[in-house]
């Protein structure tokens, strides 16, 4: 298992490096001048002398490979530069906004797990009957409706007409319900449908038939033989959804005025705050690859065949 963990971890390094190169080049070779944006956000006149000194200060007068090496070296030491807008270290700003984003993403993840698992099991138990049709309809809505559109519908229904929940802001538990549901709905619909399909597929396999012939009742067979094997695809999906939840907060946080990293990143994009954009994009890459690593390790722990397969190809 240790060899498998090391192998998976070493594969992350070239992935993150390749992503960092793409991020850097997209921002450096894109339209606009970082020096001009820095002066604009600092309320300084963009005279030729100021532009030249700003380019020197930001290192923009150096070759691209030198700029990238300097940025990567500082990023490895958690130095992502100074925000053009706030004139504060980017990492400090990120850490200030991160708790609100983690709170929202955590609430959405709990909602996904508490709803998708029971819905998937319920649909699989009542295949081609009313509960199954209801869950499949919910799944259809979830994959068809963008989260920002669902957010507007929830605000209109529960904030404008019924006035049960606040439309925006950050405070008590009432403020987190609508944004958490908006982020979680698509993922819980996908997971419920995936668990249903996995359970039905496993239920038709030979070892489940033999378990029933040995005298196990339906609940014992489901718990011991079906759910364990059917949970592997869902674990993979949940791991992917964790990164999507954090990335999906960008739009939702702006709709609900939630003071998180996503709202901060959108503001940086509009202001062309290059250090913040670079930091946020690289952070999202790291979140996705770490989530993939955790999912791979969980799958390997639950299914020894994965470890044996990796060992055979080592």
Curated annotation (Swiss-Prot):
Keywords: Cell inner membrane, Cell membrane, Ion transport, Membrane, Nickel, Nickel transport, Transmembrane, Transmembrane helix, Transport. One of its GO terms (biological process) is nickel cation import across plasma membrane. Residues 30-103, 158-169, 253-274 are periplasmic. GO terms for cellular component: ATP-binding cassette (ABC) transporter complex, substrate-binding subunit-containing; membrane; plasma membrane. Gene3D superfamilies: MetI-like. Belongs to the binding-protein-dependent transport system permease family. OppBC subfamily. This is Nickel transport system permease protein NikB. It comes from Escherichia coli (strain K12). The lineage of its organism: Bacteria, Pseudomonadati, Pseudomonadota, Gammaproteobacteria, Enterobacterales. The gene is nikB.
């Amino acid at each position: 298992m240790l060899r498998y963990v090391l192998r998976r971890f070493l594969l992350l390094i070239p992935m993150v490096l390749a992503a960092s190169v793409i991020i850097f080049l997209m921002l450096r070779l894109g339209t606009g001048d970082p020096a001009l944006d820095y002066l604009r956000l600092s309320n300084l006149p963009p005279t030729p002398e100021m532009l030249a000194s700003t380019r020197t200060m930001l290192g923009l007068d150096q070759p691209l490979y030198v700029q990238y090496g300097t940025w990567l070296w500082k990023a490895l030491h958690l130095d992502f530069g100074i925000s053009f807008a706030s004139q504060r270290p980017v990492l400090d700003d990120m850490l200030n906004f991160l708790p609100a984003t983690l709170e929202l993403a955590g609430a959405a993840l709990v909602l996904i797990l508490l709803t998708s698992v029971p819905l998937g099991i319920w649909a699989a138990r009542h295949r081609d009957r009313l509960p199954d049709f209801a869950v499949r309809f919910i799944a259809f809505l979830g994959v068809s409706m963008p989260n920002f559109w669902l957010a507007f519908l929830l605000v209109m229904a529960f904030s404008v007409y019924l006035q049960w929940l606040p439309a925006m802001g950050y405070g008590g538990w009432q403020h987190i319900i609508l944004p958490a549901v908006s982020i979680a709905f698509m993922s819980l619909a996908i997971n419920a449908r995936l668990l249903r399909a996995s359970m039905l597929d496993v239920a038709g396999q030979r070892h489940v038939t033999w378990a029933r012939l040995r005298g196990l009742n339906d609940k014992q067979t489901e718990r011991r033989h079906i759910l364990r094997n059917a949970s592997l695809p869902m674990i993979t999906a949940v791991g992917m959804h964790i990164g999507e939840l954090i990335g999906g907060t960008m739009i939702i946080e702006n709709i609900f005025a939630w003071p998180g990293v996503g709202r901060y990143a959108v503001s940086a994009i509009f202001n062309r705050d290059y250090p913040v954009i670079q930091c946020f994009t690289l952070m999202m890459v790291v979140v996705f690859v770490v989530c993939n690593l955790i999912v791979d390790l969980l799958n390997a722990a639950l299914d020894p065949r994965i470890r044996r397969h990796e060992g055979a190809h080592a």
